[in-house]
Amino acid sequence: MNRKALITGATSGIGRATALRLAREGYDIIATGRRAERLAALQHDIESAGGRCTTLTFDVRSEEEVRRALEPLERIDLLVNNAGLAAGLEHIDRGDTRDWDAMIDTNVKGLLYVTRVIAPKMVAAGGGHIFNIGSIAGTEPYENGAVYCASKHAVHAISQSMRADLLSAGIKVTEIRP
């Protein structure tokens, strides 16, 4: 039985590259994102190279969509919490609160919603590995980035706490901070 990897935000950038790489390494890929056409292109690329890929179109900002899409899954060996957003980078006194909500809902709450559904499956299976894509901005803040940097600092803290929570269940938690 092939190992299964779930990648959020797999429609571009790090998520897409990770899906392609893990498929080459023999993982069955479950690629998620908001843009169905990009997921279809990724699925085509993986399957054309001999891999296996399932796509799920949903927005990690919606707990209901996350649960509906992910609860039916039986086993996940590797989770890559990659979905992320940097929007409306402005000085704090000029920021648009809608952009702030979008970043926090995607970068923090989305990661939590996905992990809340997948972690119990890993616990039941006796192990797994969760990769959270943070950012160096989480520990090295910059001008115009207060909310984005704060959201990635949250990913850093969540990753450390998740590691402590899940270690005894045989689940590794790794934060990657590009």
Task: Describe each region flagged by the PLM.
Residues 11-12:
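Conserved glycine-rich cofactor-binding loop
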Residues 27-41:
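Conserved glycine-rich Rossmann-like NAD(P)H-binding loop of the short-chain dehydrogenase/reductase
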Residues 57-68, 97:
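The beta1-alpha1 cofactor-binding region of Rossmann-like NAD(H)/NADP(H)-dependent oxidoreductases
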Residues 93, 142-146:
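Active-site loop immediately N-terminal to the catalytic Tyr-X3-Lys motif
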Residues 115, 151:
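Active-site helix of classical SDR
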Residues 135:
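Residue(s) in the substrate-gating loop at a strand-loop-helix junction
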